[in-house]
Amino acid sequence: MFVTVGSTDSDSSKTAAKGTQKSSSSVKSGKSKKSRGLKIGGAIAGVLVIAAGSGVAVVVNNNRQIVVDAPPAVSHVSAPVTAAQSSLDDGTLAQKVSAIMDAAAADPAFGELHGIVSDATTGQKLWGINDTAVAMPASSMKILTASAALLDLGEDHRVSTRVSRITGTNDIVLHGGGDPTLSKDGEGFFQDSASIAELAKKISVVIPEGVGKVYLDNSLFTESFHETWERAGLEDGYIAPVESVMMDAGRIDPTNEESQRSATPAADAADALAKALGAENGGSLRDAAKDGQSLPLDPDPVALVQSAPLVTRVHEMMNYSDNVLAESIAREVAISRGLPPTFEGAARAVRDTLAEHGFPLDGAVLSDSSGLSTDNRISPQHLSEVLNSAAGPVESAEQGGLAEPQESSESTSLRPLLDSLPVAAVSGTLATRFVGQSGAGIVRAKTGTLNKASALAGYVVTKSGQVLTFALISNEASLLPARAAADKAASALADI
């Protein structure tokens, strides 16, 4: 079975024309494919609890046993914290990590390996190889995009899709606001998304006599398809033109993660709205305007709908490695910062945001924001720094003679990044990986795959209670062997 999506990894060797490989998901039949809302509930102090909004939880105890239960979903992501009775001092931990990773790095399956392992408690690098040198990251790039969005926009940020009325008429304009997660009828691919049906219902209340024509304003984004992307990605289901209003990120079949993507997603959304209203599709607003003159619009919108909060959309982006959603979220950051919502503007916004918060991307090349471009170059250290901030412990500060827990604003903002990472052998792009290995249910990481590039970056809780972050990027490697080598290395870290 070919189980892939996005620009990242799969257990298949299928590639597009330029070798972009799609990522694995949990299940491939209709809506049951989704593992929703996986969250870390409580500090990791010998016990890791991962609760799922779908009613499933994985509990990992000190004996590394995985127990499946069905507690309520946890609504907050707590930082991993090392066990107080950890048996390893800093020197012993570094020695063990170095021994494991030196042996792992000797595996030729890694190809040209760039890697780093750090202690999340201290941020100290425990092992590294080419860790400051840049490499092609594939979809591990999404860690940087997600981090920039959480830092700049905040986890509650939403995107609005609005409709205006052409003055003096019953004709309306659908204005794309940058949300690719809309569904047709509320039963789409993405969790808690707004729908065209909901929008139509609101419009009908304001214009009960009926709408004449529906026009599309798709002007927010001026670039939709990166010059390094392959058009074969539409048919293969891992990319679509990045337009300002889209249903299911362009999936023609929203029940199928791997569905072929539409070449005209914004026009599809406008057509769906026209049909829902029993109106005529008027086409592009730009084309409808005569002699370059704008059509007059009423100042107040007829209706609007809002996307799920950013924290939900980041989880979807990371869990399924959705490239369209990644590019759209990066453009939200660009708009927030007053930059053009283009590929270059979005990449600049990601870079500038991270630098302002203490995560400079020196030497990096950001060509797009999804990792799909083969021109991207980042280092394991770039990934490690944000992962360490997200996964680091709460610090203590003396206030009035008492130790009060506190954390940096960056750590607070980045906490949801932890929850967005797929769980080994459980969810998202790691659902079919680590099966039968000691890292199953223990490792949480973002994957990445392009031709001759494979990445795995995230964190692992060791047997001794340590929380380690890691970033492994292989270039010039065969995909499946490189992936297997990374899984083996991460599992070995879990056994420390």
For each feature predicted by the language model, list its residue ranges.
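Terminal targeting segments of Actinobacterial cell-envelope proteins
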Residues: M1-L38, R64-A73
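Hydrophobic membrane-insertion alpha-helices, especially the h-region
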Residues: A43-G55
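N-terminal low-complexity, Pro/Thr-rich disordered segments
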Residues: N63-A99, L285-R286, E398-S411, T429, ...
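Mid-domain, small-residue-enriched loop/turn segments at the edges of structured enzyme/sensor domains
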Residues: E112, N170-A197, K201-E243, G250, ...
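Active-site SXXK
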Residues: G123, P137-E155, V245, A272-L277, ...
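A small/polar active-site loop signature that marks catalytic segments
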Residues: G250-R415
